[in-house]
């Protein structure tokens, strides 16, 4: 009888320990299921990040901004300190870098609005890009004729001075991020280069 009692106690202990493991496993499974549900719910609650895109006006303005600065750097590189002696890549690499970041493009297009609208009002029957490129070409090819009819400013080629001046200051920055920040800030300013651009016009 003693042996039966011992066997009975051992079997109870054995069953209890097996049941204990099952309880722990069930508890772990339940906790994992709860944490998965919480994680799934929290992921569902996160708003889908909207893809940033440019409006047609922003795209037009950004494209003009890039075209005008690239054209200025190409035509007047020997008058832009950081682009002299064949070092145009430093100046142009920024635009390649910028092509990857829609948010920065959007911000620059917005910052360029004031300059764009001012110069567009002076362009008369020409497109914006044609008008600005004409001012750059005049400086490059026939500087003595740039003041005729005050087309690019009263008594001076203010358009060329503006874009060359900003490009020159851009080229003195050390990184693409610094160039971006400078350009954005400069486009928003009402003094400095912008004041020089807008100061002397007859029409």
Swiss-Prot record:
Residues 1-17 form the signal peptide. InterPro entries: Mlp (IPR004983). Its main location: membrane. Residues 26-47 are annotated as: Disordered. The keyword Signal applies. Keywords: Cell outer membrane, Lipoprotein, Membrane, Palmitate, Plasmid, Signal. Induction: Weakly induced when grown at 35 degrees Celsius. A lipid is attached at residue 18 (S-diacylglycerol cysteine). Disulfide bonds: none annotated. It is found in: Cell outer membrane. GO terms for cellular component: cell outer membrane. An outer membrane protein that may participate in pathogenesis. Some human Lyme disease patients have antibodies against this protein. The Mlp proteins probably undergo intragenic recombination, generating new alleles. Belongs to the Multicopy lipoprotein (Mlp) family. This is Lipoprotein MlpJ. It comes from Borreliella burgdorferi (strain ATCC 35210 / DSM 4680 / CIP 102532 / B31).
């Amino acid at each position: 009888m003693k042996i039966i009692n011992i066997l009975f106690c051992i079997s109870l202990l054995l069953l209890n320990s097996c049941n204990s493991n099952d309880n722990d496993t069930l508890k772990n499974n339940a906790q994992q299921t709860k944490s998965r549900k919480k994680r799934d719910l929290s992921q569902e609650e996160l708003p889908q990040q909207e893809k940033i895109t440019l409006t047609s006006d922003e795209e037009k303005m950004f494209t003009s901004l890039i075209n005008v600065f690239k054209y200025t750097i190409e035509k007047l590189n020997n008058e832009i300190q950081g682009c002299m002696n064949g070092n145009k890549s430093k100046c142009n690499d920024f635009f390649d870098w910028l092509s990857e970041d829609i948010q920065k493009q959007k911000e620059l297009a917005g910052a360029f609005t004031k300059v764009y609208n001012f110069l567009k009002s002076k362009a008369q029957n020409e497109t914006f890009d044609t008008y600005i490129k004409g001012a750059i070409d005049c400086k490059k090819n026939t500087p003595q004729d740039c003041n005729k009819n005050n087309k690019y400013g009263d008594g001076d080629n203010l358009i060329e001075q503006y874009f060359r001046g900003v490009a020159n200051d851009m080229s003195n920055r050390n990184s693409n991020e610094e160039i971006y920040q400078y350009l954005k800030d400069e486009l928003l300013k009402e003094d400095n280069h912008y004041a020089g651009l807008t100061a002397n016009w007859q029409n």
